Every structure is written in structure tokens, then in C-alpha cells.
Amino acid sequence: MTSPANPSEVTRDRRNRGVAFVCAGVFVAMVGMSFAAVPLYRLFCQVTGYGGTTQRVEQYSDTILDRTINVRFDANTSGVPWEFKPKQREITLRIGETTEIAYVARNNAPTTTTGTATYNVAPALAGAYFNKIECFCFTKQSLEPGQTYEMPVQFFVDPEIVNVPELKNLKTITLSYTFYPNNQESAEGPAEGAAKTQKLGG
């Protein structure tokens, strides 16, 4: 005959099972949060301009200032067999004025390749005031073998930038893009450790 279980052992077994269930639940929650972290971080960056992330808008500025600012354009690739460059390296425009420029990409691979562009602005604080209306970076881009494709960007610099003490004397903004293979997790948000660039001032 089997002797009855010791009450203390039963209690300990129940406690151990409870701890195991809690640990398993925490693990599942952490895995779920890790998958959600990237899109949530991107959304945060796009809303606040964190780390030089530019803003996406649907309408033009209704205010155009007499003051001008220079915008430089930078292009990079990482892991895609493309030539990628801006048609113009630098332009001068009035603050609040909507302008369209273009980048050009050429696929040097013997197969069709697809890329996704990440983007940021320097100085990082200016990202919250750099507003894009149209951009190739909003969607993935596919190029056939040897295809050359011109990709427009339509943007303006928010007039509110002149009310920010750290930016009121800013002369030049640099807009930078990097194309990654579409099957990689691209970082539309900033690099780790980038400075916060939430809009300041009135």
C-alpha cells in the first residue's frame, strides 16, 4: 500500500508548478513584446521625430517664410546590389515651401531585387520639422535586372523650426537614405542612443 503524501510535499509541488506556469507566461509575454517592439518603436519615431526621423504629412504648409535653408541629400546601400544616388546633392529653399527632388536607383543584379529605404535627418533635432508628403521610402521598391528607376521625394521644412532656440540659426539640413534588402528588418527609427527630437517650442 502506498503511504499518503506528506502535506508539505504536496504544497511544495503545487508551489513549484505555479512558479513554472508564471515563468512560462512571462517568457511568452516577452517573446510577444519583442515582436511588437520594432513596429511600436517605428510608430513612436514617426510621431515624435525621435533620433532624426522625419515626419509624414498629407498637406502642404500654408505658411512660407522669407528665410531660406539648405538641404543636402545623402544615399547609401546595405546588402542590395544597387547604385543609388540623389539627382541633386544640395538645394536651397524657403522654409515652408514645398519642393520635389529625386533619387535614382539602378539594379546591377541579374535578378529582380526588392529594397526598403530607411531615412533620417541631421541634425537629429530637425527631424521633427522635416515633413514629407510623398516619398519612395513609404513603400518597398522592386527593380528588374538592369532597371534604372527615378524616385521622387516631396517635402517642406516646417516654419515652426524658427521658434526652436536650438534650431533658429540652422543653415543646413541633411536628408539621408539607406536601402536594405526587403527581407531584412530595416530600422526606420534611429540608431540606438540617438537623441530625442520631439518638437519643441510653440
From Swiss-Prot:
Cytoplasmic side stretches: 1-14
Keyword check for Cell inner membrane: yes
Keyword Membrane: yes
Pfam families linked to this entry: CtaG_Cox11 (PF04442)
MF (Gene Ontology): copper ion binding
Job of this protein: Exerts its effect at some terminal stage of cytochrome c oxidase synthesis, probably by being involved in the insertion of the copper B into subunit I.
HAMAP family recorded: CtaG
Name of this protein: Cytochrome c oxidase assembly protein CtaG
Organism from which the protein derives: Chelativorans sp. (strain BNC1)
Gene: ctaG
